[in-house]
Amino acid sequence: MKKLLLLLAAGAVLASAGMLYLPVYPAAVWVFDESKGEVVDRIPLVTGTPMSIRLSPDHKRIYVGTIDHNGIEVIDVATHKVINHFILNTPTKQFRFWNGTPDPQGKLFYTVSKEIEKFSDHYEVGKPKYTVIDLEQQKIIKTAELGKEEQSDNDIDFGRAALEVSPDGKLLYQFGEHITILQADDFKIVEKLELAKPNFPGMEHVHFGGDLDLINEPGQHFAIFNSEDPIVHNKVFGLARFDLSTRQMDFTEVGPAPAGIAGLEVTPDKKLAYTVVENGKHGNKRCEFWAFDLTTDRITQKEEVPCRTRFTLGISTDGKKLYIYGAGFEIEVYDAKTLKYEKTWNLNVDVTYAGIVVTP
């Protein structure tokens, strides 16, 4: 399960094509016009290769994390200009982080980081820590140790468990094998929502996971989850809904879990969703589009699609097209209604696996 998606606002059915912000090698974000099918701007980055990208709650800024020196760059959506950039590394320390989220005011950036200190004869690698970065001071202003139970969401590929700040800026949510709700000012745990007991009997080990993709309705989430029974370890997958304000979760089992699921993309009217599933390995690997009716939580359509070793699934701003991209030079376009291939946009540049940002 690769993607955890915020629900789209009820009235936000978009009639026109939008802009795709694509993180590319070696150090840039390209702006791609959906209607023209071409790159319309190139935003150079100062601090290195982009490895994470996140849209602000008000859709006015884009936050990019870079890997070369562990930097952050802030892009103004209106002008396509970098308005703030800095690195966290010092000559003797690295502060590695994967992704994160800004606060509603755009002053702070929350992430999970790992400190690596260089000595004359060795390196010391610290444990992952909750981290607050002041975007104006351009430095880390606070860290906090993770509890033992939070280590499982951060030890492997630390910091990939998705983070989100509540609309009032007071709470921080981390999504992984459970949902951890913390006070944003001191990282004290307010509540932990265990995902081991969905509302169908005999199942455990539910896992949300993945990246949050900010859309229009803060605090509302659709997700694909995996679960297995504790006796014979029969794995199933399903759809989950989670409301940050009420902390209510709703699980619906769909069927046997495939070997891999590449995210969940939701249409603007919240009636349909799409994913790509993988089964088999190597020469026997088979991939399919699956379409879901979110009013019934059932699969309505399947269509085979060529497999890639690595890829990301995306959706157009009007919900009519599906994109397969990442770790390559192309964006493949599919019709969401028929799930059939339409065309390929050749970018002539390597897109990173940081994801994309889509704006109207």
What is each residue range found by the language model?
Residues 17-18, 58-60, 105-107, 168-170, ...:
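Short coil/turn segments that connect the beta-strands within blades of beta-propeller domains
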Residues 16-41:
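An edge-strand/N-cap motif at the start of beta-rich repeat modules
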Residues 49-55, 93-102, 151-164, 199-215, ...:
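Repeated scaffold domains used in trafficking and secretory/extracellular systems
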Residues 125-138, 236-244, 287-293:
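Beta-propeller blade signature
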Residues 38-44, 81-90, 139-154, 188-203, ...:
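A short beta-strand motif characteristic of beta-propeller blades
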Residues 111-127, 219-234, 276-286:
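Short, conserved, GDST-rich strand-edge loop motifs in beta-rich repeat architectures
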Residues 325-360:
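Blade-level signature of beta-propeller repeat domains, shared across WD40, Kelch, NHL, RCC1
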